[in-house]
């Protein structure tokens, strides 16, 4: 979870469906999943265990296996800030040096190079539908950014949205 890494805390994004989203206002239901933030792994594990009902998650144990980490530099890597590049380099160094782990570089298959655009269209399309009530009842209270996202999403044809969902599903299966 990006915010956790930026703030120096622990974040965990579980698999889709691990934690029920009942009662949550979702912006993009096919992309959103609930996770947890905390000051340490044990706190996050306890939170996810409580929210999911998977109480085994609360039993954090030390792993004695060396970590295996993969670095995937997508076509968007060229836009990464120097701070982001430095953080990735530091994480790689730490995994290799301190944890004696194996870090591999992997390439994104060419057929997945459009995932960022696909994800963006899915998100915008779903935002447009998810915020229909707010747009109809409280349009003047919505920020310019949200209004713009709603408008962009409304302009995406359902046929394109469905194609994007299919491509995202194919990509998940490839990974």
PLM regions and their residue ranges:
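Generic secondary-structure signature for well-ordered alpha-helical cores
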Residues: 17, 24, 36-42, 49-57, ...
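Active-site oxyanion-binding pockets that recognize sulfate/phosphate
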Residues: 31-34, 77-78, 85, 154, ...
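Short low-complexity, flexible loop/linker segments enriched in glycine and/or proline
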Residues: 6-9, 113, 117-123
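A non-catalytic, amphipathic alpha-helix used as a structural packing/dimerization or gating element
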Residues: 43-46, 87-90, 163-170, 174
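Short helix-loop capping/hinge segments that flank enzyme active sites or metal/cofactor-binding pockets
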Residues: 66-68, 121-172
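Short glycine/serine-rich loop segments
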Residues: 1-48
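Gly/Ser-rich, acidic/histidine-flanked active-site/gating loops
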Residues: 33, 50-119
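A generic local structural motif
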Residues: 55-58, 171-175
